Amino acid sequence: MAYGKAHLEAQLKRALAEEIQALEDPRLFLLTVEAVRLSKDGSVLSVYVEAFREEEGALRALSRAERRLVAALARRVRMRRLPRLEFLPWRASPA
């Protein structure tokens, strides 16, 4: 993996974790962003999360907040084109 992509993924992970925490949704309590993977063309960002409570509810809450999270990423991370966010449970992460 190129340094640039790894660095960008780290920035996106950090920014997303902070923005998710700022949502103050009770379904997102004790939710951790474990990893992010940017697709080769940069159009999709797979976000792997672990919820210590109701995981399905947390994934639904994140999907509903996708537009708000992308807008927040636009303010924090400089990218030519922002990716679509795809929220997945941590156990489904690629090896």
UniProtKB/Swiss-Prot annotation:
Coiled-coil intervals: none
GO biological process: maturation of SSU-rRNA
Entry annotated with the keyword Acetylation: no
Biological role stated in the UniProt entry: One of several proteins that assist in the late maturation steps of the functional core of the 30S ribosomal subunit. Associates with free 30S ribosomal subunits (but not with 30S subunits that are part of 70S ribosomes or polysomes). Required for efficient processing of 16S rRNA. Probably interacts with the 5'-terminal helix region of 16S rRNA, bringing together different domains of the 30S ribosomal subunit which aids assembly.
InterPro entries linked to this entry: KH_dom-like_a/b (IPR015946), RbfA (IPR000238), RbfA_dom_sf (IPR023799)
UniProt organism field: Thermus thermophilus (strain ATCC 27634 / DSM 579 / HB8)
GO cellular component term of the entry, any: cytosol
Subcellular localization(s) per the UniProt record: Cytoplasm
Keywords: Cytoplasm, Ribosome biogenesis, RNA-binding, rRNA-binding
HAMAP family, per the entry: RbfA
Top-level taxon: Bacteria
Stated name of the protein: Ribosome-binding factor A
GO MF annotation, one: rRNA binding
Primary location: cytoplasm
Subunit structure: Interacts with the 30S ribosomal subunit as a monomer, binding in a position overlapping the sites of the A and P site tRNAs, and displacing segments of the 16S rRNA. Probably contacts 16S rRNA and ribosomal protein S9 and S13.
Pfam families: RBFA
Keyword Signal on entry: no
Family: Belongs to the RbfA family.
